[in-house]
Regions:
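Extracellular glycoside hydrolase catalytic/binding regions
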Residues: 1-83
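Aromatic-rich peripheral "rim/lid" segments of glycoside hydrolase catalytic domains that contact
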Residues: 63-115
Length: 115
């Protein structure tokens, strides 16, 4: 799993409490955290010969701006692609989802930014 930084990826999540209730924006601090952790994963792969798979990542869509979510998805998936680290976005049609079950459509602001 990777949810760097949780103050951004979990903002507005009802199960966390008030700690992440403030609106946060995707910025260089978050970019740097993602890059640092993915570089660490790549170094681990190279050192051990074991592949890393980020089995869960995403942004809770409670109060985050769609533009910030798009930028996060774009950046995170691009870093993974550049470093050849496999990933799986969390999840299909709930709080982090790529699909709007009520509308019966994919969320362009998420799905269009995968690399």
């Amino acid at each position: 799993h990777n949810y760097d930084t949780m103050s951004f990826t979990h903002q507005g999540a009802t199960w966390i409490g008030d700690g992440f209730a403030n609106k946060d924006h995707f910025d260089d601090e978050i970019r740097n955290a993602i890059k640092e952790h993915m570089d660490y994963c790549k170094a681990y792969e190279e050192r051990t010969g074991r592949k890393v798979w980020i089995s869960e990542w995403g942004v809770y869509q409670g109060i985050a701006d769609k533009e910030d979510i798009s930028a996060y998805v774009d950046y995170f998936s691009n870093v993974c692609k550049e470093l050849e680290i496999a990933y799986c976005y969390w999840e299909f049609c709930s709080g982090y989802g790529i699909y709007d079950l009520t509308a019966g459509t994919f969320k362009d602001f998420v799905i269009n930014y995968f690399h």
